[in-house]
Amino acid sequence: MFGKLIANKRVLIAAVVISILAIYFIPLGSHGLLEPDEGRYSEIPREMIESGNFITPMLNHVKYFEKPVLLYWMNAASFMTFGQNEFAARFATALCAVLGAAAAGALGTFIFGGTAGLISAVVTALSLLYFAIGTINITDMPLGFFLTVGMSAFYVGHIGGNKK
């Protein structure tokens, strides 16, 4: 029976995707925000929503330009979608983690084929440190995601049709 399940590649891929989504998103709201970083990166978008100023990040009503504003915008969108809670505060980084694993899988598929791509996505998503960073609200995972996508796009563009 298990052999037939694996034989149907679409079912296997769907099961892997659903499992990884569950592993990342279900526990996001299970504990309070970790200080100081999660509190800081959650307060800034809360103040953006409160003031209506999405250009200048403010922390306790003082300009805060120490980090790029994209994470604050993603968190503000998450707060407006899911409400102001722990799940919403961590949603953007978890989404970046899952999409980063998918990008690693896509690059693996491009270079080595479908099986290697699936394995690379699963190994990336289930790596302990990657998972830990991907489920807390800090800037590391969005940075890693955009670097992965950018470098993968460069590689695919550079190799292009010359892939052997």
Show the residue positions of the predicted features.
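Membrane-integral, polyisoprenol-dependent glycosyltransferases
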Residues: 2-164
